[in-house]
Regions:
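Histidine-centered, metal-coordinating catalytic motifs and their short helical/loop contexts
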Residues: 104-120
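Amphipathic alpha-helical interface segments
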Residues: 1-105
């Protein structure tokens, strides 16, 4: 992941107090804390995720690395959903009907559902 892109987003959000003042109490909800939490988790994932550590070996260490990779993707997805709920629309799911990420699926389903299946 591109850490520089994450930092640019954080810098843009923190560029002035406008975002803070708009979202600290929006419709009685503190959405500023949601934004900050999502930015923090995206940064953690961007700093930690390492697809090069994945291996084709069938051993415990490889299983743990794969599990960590899937958890990182899941945390990233949750953070993106939270930002979507705050900035775009709280009633829709981003990329709901997308099927461009998993191009060689084992099962015919949209990417969101397919990832849930992998994660399970």
């Amino acid at each position: 992941m591109d850490m520089e892109l994450c930092m640019q987003f954080r810098d843009k959000v923190n560029e002035n107090d406008l975002v803070y003042h708009i979202y600290r109490n929006r419709d009685g909800k503190n959405q500023w804390s949601i934004i900050c939490s999502a930015m923090d988790w995206i940064e953690v994932v961007a700093d930690s995720i390492d697809s090069s550590a994945l291996s084709l070996k069938n051993d415990n260490a490889s299983s743990v690395k794969l599990m960590t990779f899937v958890v990182c993707i899941d945390v990233l997805w949750e953070a993106v959903q939270q930002l979507h709920r705050v900035f775009i629309d709280s009633n829709t799911i981003p990329f709901k009907d997308d099927d461009s990420v998993f191009v060689k699926k084992q099962f015919p389903m949209k990417d969101n559902q397919y990832f849930k299946t992998i994660r399970a």
